[in-house]
């Protein structure tokens, strides 16, 4: 017999078999063929359409998937007899083919589980490869894809669980904070180009009021007034460990004070006022940056001991700014520092190379607010004045701008949180639509978490500083949970940013390096030796 005859014979058998199913109905077919008392043959059964006794017999026996030894009866029948053509076994898993399996509850459960498992596998495969089954190979127009994260079955439960929390967070209004302490500060200068607050890790707050320096501590309150002068104070700064207080005045006088002493140990005079001071945050050296009104930056090493006190001029930077320097800050380990000026310019320097800036970024207003991120070494935030009103974020390793945030107000200070992925900002002059004077934003979402309105209209926050404490074991300075803000209404307010607050963004993980990963630290340019430790 030819192969064509065999194919036609199979087709004829299938057609008659399907006709039988349709005529007798599926119920009759199931009860006759699959009933519990149905007779099951132990040998293959040939369907003869002309034989009424075999016309309604299912051509599948219970031994269909039973294995036979080589050379057994089944193999011989299949090879030597046409009885091997008595059954058609579909070798496909196509969902459109007719299933002839036993439709018991167990079979249905197995089919459903298999189908669900297959569907889950397909969804996981789509998610992993970022493709969709609906995509057409010959569709050349770019179709808008749905969110692939919604297709991953393993994410469905967690997404449903977090959906309420996410929506609540997105729809939640910023929190309002109340100060836990308020100090009067008569004659506090309302001047964007000065820096009149400094906190010592020993617990003292230095405040420049007109020509005087006041010291305040939690235990003693206002303690004493340092030497009076006829020239107003324009900048104050405590050294890293709090041993030295540097004071700059509008006439260019630079003084260095020791605790419990009534006269300065060192006094230097420069022409032009001193708007900002910044100590290098390390124990090994007392290096100080001095920002001048003419745009120059002086770099001093201060030798400070019981027997000797002197200031050594290390360098004078003249190629950074053309106008007054109003912002200076170091990164956490003293390897870089940044300066901002009234010439709308931000300059980034290597601490080991003072000859020229590493990068220069142009803004649209004077830049006073500068802050390096303590847990991401490559990140620098800059805040510009009333003609710009933007916070910009830069990568300190390649000089590229990462992001920016329009605040609608003059930015007077920025402080990164040492514990959470967020930063606080104080504002000066603002638009009518922007009323807050102090805010906390999440990073990198840039969502406003805290918004503090002014107690009286038309005031601005001019100066601010984060509190810190000295670790007696390591001798190092650690940031704490408060921010101190001086406003143009001659008040100084203390705000609590402690861990008990519910509005915080995600927490910075505990680390011994910057990222708890040598690979990431290598990418960030970190050699594993740092001079500070964040909790």
Swiss-Prot record:
Biological process terms in GO annotation: anaphase-promoting complex-dependent catabolic process; positive regulation of anaphase-promoting complex-dependent catabolic process
GO molecular function, one term: anaphase-promoting complex binding
Keywords of the record: Repeat, WD repeat
SMART domains, sorted: WD40
WD repeat residue intervals: 189-226, 228-267, 269-314, 320-359, 362-404, 462-505
Similarity annotation: Belongs to the WD repeat CDC20/Fizzy family.
Entry protein name: Uncharacterized WD repeat-containing protein C13G6.08
Organism: Schizosaccharomyces pombe (strain 972 / ATCC 24843)
């Amino acid at each position: 017999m030819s192969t064509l005859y065999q194919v036609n014979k199979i087709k004829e058998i299938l057609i008659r078999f399907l006709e039988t199913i349709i005529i007798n109905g599926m119920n009759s077919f199931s009860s006759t063929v699959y009933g519990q008392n149905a007779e099951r043959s132990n040998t293959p059964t040939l369907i003869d359409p002309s034989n009424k006794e075999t016309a309604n017999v299912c051509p599948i026996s219970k031994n269909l998937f039973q294995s036979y030894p080589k050379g057994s009866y089944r193999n011989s029948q299949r090879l030597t007899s046409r009885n091997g053509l008595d059954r058609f076994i579909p070798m496909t898993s196509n969902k459109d083919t007719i299933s002839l399996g036993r439709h018991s509850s167990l079979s249905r459960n197995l089919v459903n589980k298999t189908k669900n498992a297959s569907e889950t596998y397909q969804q996981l495969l789509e998610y992993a490869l970022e493709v969709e089954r609906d995509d057409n190979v010959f569709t050349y127009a770019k179709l808008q894809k749905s969110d692939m994260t919604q297709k991953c079955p393993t994410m469905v439960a967690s997404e449903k669980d977090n959906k309420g929390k996410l929506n609540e967070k997105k729809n939640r209004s910023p929190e309002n904070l109340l100060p836990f302490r308020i100090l009067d500060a008569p004659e506090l200068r309302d001047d964007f180009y000065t820096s009149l607050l400094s906190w010592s890790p020993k617990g003292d707050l230095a405040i420049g009021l007109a020509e005087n320096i006041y010291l305040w501590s939690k235990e003693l309150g206002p303690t004493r007034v340092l030497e009076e002068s006829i020239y107003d104070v324009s900048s104050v700064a405590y050294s890293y460990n709090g041993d030295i207080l540097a004071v700059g005045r509008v006439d260019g006088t630079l003084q260095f004070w020791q605790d419990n002493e009534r006269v300065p140990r060192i006094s230097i005079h420069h022409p032009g006022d001193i708007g900002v001071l910044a100590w290098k945050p390390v124990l090994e050296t007392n290096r100080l940056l001095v920002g001048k009104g003419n745009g120059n930056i002086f770099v001093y090493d201060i030798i400070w001991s019981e027997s000797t006190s002197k200031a050594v001029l290390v360098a004078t930077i003249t190629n950074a700014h053309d106008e007054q320097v109003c912002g200076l800050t170091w990164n956490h380990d003293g390897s870089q520092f940044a300066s901002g000026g009234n010439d709308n310019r931000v300059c980034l320097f290597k601490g080991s190379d003072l000859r020229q800036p590493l990068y220069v970024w142009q803004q649209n207003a004077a830049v006073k607010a500068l802050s390096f991120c303590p847990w991401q070494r490559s990140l620098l935030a800059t805040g510009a004045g009333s003609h710009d009103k933007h916070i910009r974020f830069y990568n300190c390793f390649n000089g590229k701008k990462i992001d920016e945030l329009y605040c609608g107000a003059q930015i007077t200070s920025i402080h990164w949180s040492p514990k959470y992925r967020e930063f606080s900002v104080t504002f000066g002059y603002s638009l009518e639509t922007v009323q807050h004077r102090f805010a906390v934003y999440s990073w990198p979402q840039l969502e406003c978490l805290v918004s503090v309105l002014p107690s009286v209209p038309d005031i601005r926050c001019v100066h601010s500083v984060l509190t810190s404490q000295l670790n007696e074991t390591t001798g190092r300075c650690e940031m704490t949970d408060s921010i101190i803000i001086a406003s143009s209404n001659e008040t100084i307010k203390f705000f609590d940013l402690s861990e008990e607050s519910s509005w915080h963004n995600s927490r910075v993980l505990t680390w011994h390096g910057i990222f708890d990963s040598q690979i990431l630290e290598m990418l960030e340019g970190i050699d594993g030796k740092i001079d500070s430790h964040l909790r």
